Amino acid sequence: MNIVPSKKLIDKLLYMEVDDNDFHQATLNIMYQEWQTNYIGYTYKEILDWFEDTYDSFAKFAVLIGKYNQQVCNGGHIQYFDNGYANGDGGCFYKHSSSIPLHNELIKLFEKTELKEDELSLKVLKILKKFEIEEEDDEILNYDYLRALDSEYYKLCNEFMELINDYIKHKIIGE
């Protein structure tokens, strides 16, 4: 069964009068604004759970894939891990679990979208599934592997983010 946006999310985005090219970023902004205004003490995982409970799994997927893209494009998969976005607890300088639970949830949600039928999306999904952290004594051991994974993603990320925004726009306004 595919995930779809809730009426509440659709209404919120339409009320915001979002520019056609910004549906994805607008979804991230909704969560970030709530986090900074009303839930400042929450961890990333806690605010994501609140966002999913308030809106839906579709909204959570939009945030997870957006933060993945932002973190990887800014500093690679190592930054994505080190800043806590693959794990959900704490931020930079915290100890994060190499079991990467939020990243695994991203993959599960991705597989519940129609994106799994698109060739470009399948390439990105393959990269997502290849992401893993090998560490010993808080040192990342698979640095070269992660840098190669970064390079793979960088070749696809701009086109993929356009696809994500178009996908979200289509789900919100049906165009």
Task: Annotate each language-model stretch with its function.
Residues 2-104, 108-175:
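Extended, alpha-helix-rich binding/interface surfaces that flank or overlap catalytic cores
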